[in-house]
């Protein structure tokens, strides 16, 4: 205790004036000091929303696809795309020594859509092991996409070897190598030069299950 220096009211006001939902960011950065008094200790300079699916509006329109509003609809759309001869997903887990982290994001998003936040917290704090049936259920769901050769650009063997920075390129080829790419809000930095937001690409929320009463969770970092 006592290791953090409070930032003071001027910085707090700056956050309130300039950050969307400023009070929520202040709340996340406020902790009790050694005397039990609440202190504002930090500002967020970068955050990413991870529960996003990127796609080409033209590809959707040309094929008659609509943005899904539930996970059930997303999986039905995935199957429809494959039946139409299109590849639904581009997935790339490659990241040098950090290879695999995009799968973690998939797993976290799925856990938040299949179980309560309390279960998710138990998992990420290691109170619940990775071989817990609830975690295995999420792995099986991810595997139903990533291990299906008809669902992934390059087939399942390409998932681990495709670099995450290159994975979304399939959205922009002609013909498209994939229809959708689940990745965080930072990924447009790796899109091909010259593509335009809202024209060449757009995104939708990685949806929740309509059949589960778990709200609309959003994963961030």
Q: What positions do the PLM features span?
A:
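Extracytoplasmic "Venus flytrap"/periplasmic binding protein-like
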Residues: 1-24, 58-69, 170-172, 179-180, ...
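Hinge/lid segment of periplasmic solute-binding proteins
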Residues: 2-52, 102
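Short, solvent-exposed loop/beta-turn-alpha elements that line the ligand-binding surface or hinge
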Residues: 8-23, 112-137, 193-194, 208-218
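Extracytoplasmic/periplasmic solute-binding protein
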Residues: 32-47, 51, 75-128
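Extracytoplasmic/periplasmic substrate-recognition and gating elements
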Residues: 38, 62, 193-221
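Short helix-initiation/N-cap motifs at beta->coil->alpha
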Residues: 71-75, 156-170
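Glycine-centered hinge/linker elements that transmit conformational signals in sensory
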Residues: 78-80, 124-160, 206
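Alpha-to-beta junction loops
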Residues: 85-88, 174-183
